[in-house]
């Protein structure tokens, strides 16, 4: 069935509710559709500022070979990626992360990058929020250079490793197809790694009209037939220049651009987009809209060596902006809220970690220090509020005493490997693997709205057997 044949008005769409349906996956909302925005740090920030909103979900990317974009800036011409920074900026938003194989899918499947996979999983898992992992995103996209067997093996490996490391409740795995019109139909089964290792089916939605919505419909039906929730992981009105109010039917170079009114742009791309969601309301549980000036990013800019994309920023046209806001006000869409994580089926682990650390540190360290030191002042090296405790010859606890910061988020870092700290005994703490006697750089980052917005503190130490706090 062609989706345009069932077009209804936005007013009618707004009156319909997305029905509850028991789907087989992780971090799936019982009711509603998660609204997320991408896909680079600065575009997300611009959207949040222009729309005066905190996105319920934010999207970014990591390369598996060098973990570029995980905890440092990486820009391959498509906007800046820095997952940890994005997590810092939006500590109460869900995180959607695309992982590129960098053309190395065979080596990934054979285990060459297992250490990087562990670092990725641990970093994401410790962010204490729902994380949706788009492993080898657009699995069947010919530009990615994947092969079916290594793709499936790597998917199974990562799914299992997430559970071995204890993050099965934190990280949900998305199998995302490209929904690319030139792709032949009937190929999805060859890329499918198995119902037991897929939490969500994802798709891309750019110019589905080029093939009469056949590829996105095929992906949706695949999700339905496997009882999996559906996530539109990449979507943007490709070839529309919203700022200029133009459209080109030329996907390669964007030639012969036609002028469009704001109303035409909405009715041609946005209305069918939301209609697709309505038509698949039994399985559709999340979408990411890429709100970016593609033309300003050199990878997508003239001479358009990777095709013509345009400008998809909804805030640049008053009518589009208002329609977008009005549509997302419908309660079927899951926007940012204080109970967002609960709606997504996520239970924060801060209480558990805080309880464990608080109990161990408060009981063991408090008792040991009080008894051993006989009530005297702690050793001189323990006077610094930013310090460490010996846990074992292979483990160090890094901590910073709470100075009354607002602390909506905080990160404790060892040699620039940063994880959210757990507050206990009046300090923010995190335990890391380390080697006794080695030198390390400690970093502490914390939100400080009462001061200058944030505080970042560094110090260098030698790991000894000291126990301070």
Curated annotation (Swiss-Prot):
Residues 1-22 form the signal peptide. Disulfide bonds join 382-468, 413-418. PROSITE patterns: GH26. It holds the Pfam family AlcCBM31. InterPro entries: Beta-xylanase, Beta-xylanase_CBM31_sf, GH26_dom, Glyco_hydro_26, Glycoside_hydrolase_SF. Residues 23-293 form the GH26 domain. GO terms for biological process: cellulose catabolic process; substituted mannan metabolic process; xylan catabolic process. Optimum pH is 7.0-7.5. Stable from pH 5.0-11.0. Retains 65% and 70% of activity respectively when incubated at pH 4.0 and 12.0 for 24 hours. Completely inhibited by CuCl(2), FeCl(3), HgCl(2) and N-bromosuccinimide. Moderately inhibited by AgCl, AlCl(3), Pb(CH(3)COO)(2) and dithiothreitol. BaCl(2), CaCl(2), KCl, MgCl(2), MnCl(2), NaCl, ZnCl(2), ethylenediaminetetraacetic acid, N-ethylmaleimide, iodoacetic acid and p-chloromercuribenzoic acid have little or no effect on activity. The keyword Signal applies. It catalyses: Random hydrolysis of (1->3)-beta-D-glycosidic linkages in (1->3)-beta-D-xylans. Residues 352-374 have a biased composition (Gly residues). SUPFAM superfamilies: (Trans)glycosidases. Transmembrane segments: none annotated. Its EC number is 3.2.1.32. Residues 352-380 are annotated as: Disordered. Belongs to the glycosyl hydrolase 26 family. The carbohydrate binding module (CBM) binds to insoluble beta-1,3-xylan, but not to insoluble beta-1,4-xylan, beta-1,4-glucan, beta-1,4-mannan, curdlan, chitin, or soluble polysaccharides. This is Beta-1,3-xylanase. It comes from Alcaligenes sp. The lineage of its organism: Bacteria, Pseudomonadati, Pseudomonadota, Betaproteobacteria, Burkholderiales.
